[in-house]
């Protein structure tokens, strides 16, 4: 009796499922047969009342197979009706192609990122390789190896950020320049020359005003080989500044003093009719620095330079206040930022 009843229900349900014309109708059919009070659900419950074990197994197997077949049919019909519904909706929802597009907010490249990319590109065209080093450094790499005397003002706590705790029994500082990277590069060198690197990165000094920031970006350059002289340095600096600011830029070198270079120079560019603005520091690597990293100063020589990224960006893009770089104001970035298509390819 149960066998014939379930097969009749199968035929009836199959016919209703295939003839359903909407998702709502299909859902009501599903509930009618498989809901808590559904007709097929009732058949499943009645299997437990069959006393003969073999018959109960046979009927149960048949009912489960029919249930699986009907549920598969419901899912198939559901997909079919869903596609029909979407197609009908697409036909109704016509798009007016004459309407203007919605405005899109396009991200812009920060001036510092743009400047870093451009400076790296210029020096890579001269054969300089990219190097990096830790921002948290010991005094040897930041000061001692760079021929900076124990009483030098740069080592005072009002100029430099020192950690209170010692690391391996050494005082640790937030690096004040990326010159520490040149020390690590020369220490790691195993007689492979030339050493020709640039080291961009963040540096830290205890200063904060319109032209100074406690954290800023610097690029260190280093070239070590036999017979390197001041002429090589001047050519390199001239090449960079003319590529960065334009061929018509006027450049001058002034004598200066840095403990890690001898001779040392500061480089200015002309702004307006009379004004000269310092742009970077440079010089020939001091003999003591080469000796500190086990390079024979009688065999090898070289030059180094340091460029403040914020400084050259302010001059090139006419930005008056360095602190604006870190203000996180969207209006400022929209004004001074760059489209990514402005990046030169490296």
From Swiss-Prot:
Name of the protein in question: Phenylalanine--tRNA ligase alpha subunit
HAMAP family: Phe_tRNA_synth_alpha1
Residue ranges the record marks as coiled coil: none
UniProt keyword annotation of Magnesium present: yes
PROSITE patterns: AA_TRNA_LIGASE_II
Entry's Gene Ontology molecular function annotations: ATP binding; magnesium ion binding; phenylalanine-tRNA ligase activity; tRNA binding
EC number: 6.1.1.20
Catalysed reactions, as listed in the record: tRNA(Phe) + L-phenylalanine + ATP = L-phenylalanyl-tRNA(Phe) + AMP + diphosphate + H(+)
Residues that hold Mg(2+) according to the record: 262
Keyword field contains Ligase: yes
Cofactor(s), by name: Mg(2+)
Family affiliation: Belongs to the class-II aminoacyl-tRNA synthetase family. Phe-tRNA synthetase alpha subunit type 1 subfamily.
Classification via Pfam families: Phe_tRNA-synt_N, tRNA-synt_2d
Residues annotated as signal peptide: none
């Amino acid at each position: 009796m149960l066998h014939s009843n379930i097969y009749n229900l199968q035929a009836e349900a199959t016919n209703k499922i295939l003839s359903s014309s909407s998702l709502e109708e299909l859902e009501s059919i599903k509930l009618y047969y498989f809901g808590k009070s559904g007709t097929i659900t009732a058949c499943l419950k009645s299997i437990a009342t069959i006393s003969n074990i073999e018959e109960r197994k046979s009927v149960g197997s048949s009912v489960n197979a029919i249930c699986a077949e009907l549920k598969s049919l419901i899912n198939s019909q559901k997909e079919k009706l869903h596609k029909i519904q979407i197609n009908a909706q697409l036909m109704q929802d016509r798009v007016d192609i004459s309407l203007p597009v919605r405005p899109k907010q396009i991200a812009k490249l920060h001036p510092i990122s743009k400047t870093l990319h451009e400076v790296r590109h210029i020096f890579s065209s001269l054969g300089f390789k990219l190097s990096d080093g830790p921002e948290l450094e010991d005094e040897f790499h930041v000061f001692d190896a760079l021929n900076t005397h124990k009483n030098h003002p740069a080592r005072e706590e009002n100029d430099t950020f020192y950690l209170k705790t010692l690391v391996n029994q050494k005082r640790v500082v937030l690096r004040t320049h990326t010159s520490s990277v040149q020390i690590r590069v020369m220490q790691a060198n195993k007689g492979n020359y030339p050493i020709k690197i640039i080291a961009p990165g963040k540096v830290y000094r205890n200063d904060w005003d319109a032209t100074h920031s406690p954290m800023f970006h610097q690029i260190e350059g280093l070239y070590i080989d036999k017979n390197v002289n001041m002429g090589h340095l001047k050519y390199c600096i001239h090449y960079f500044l003319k590529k960065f600011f334009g061929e018509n830029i006027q450049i001058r070198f002034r004598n200066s003093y840095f403990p890690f270079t001898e001779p040392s120079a500061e480089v200015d560019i002309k702004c307006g009719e009379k004004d000269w603005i310092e742009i970077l520091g440079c010089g020939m690597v001091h003999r003591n620095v080469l000796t500190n990293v086990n390079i024979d100063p009688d065999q090898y020589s070289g030059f180094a330079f340091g460029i403040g990224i914020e400084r050259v960006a302010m001059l090139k893009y006419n930005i008056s206040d360095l602190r604006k770089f870190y203000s996180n104001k969207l209006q400022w970035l929209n004004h001074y930022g760059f489209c990514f298509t402005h990046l030169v390819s490296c």
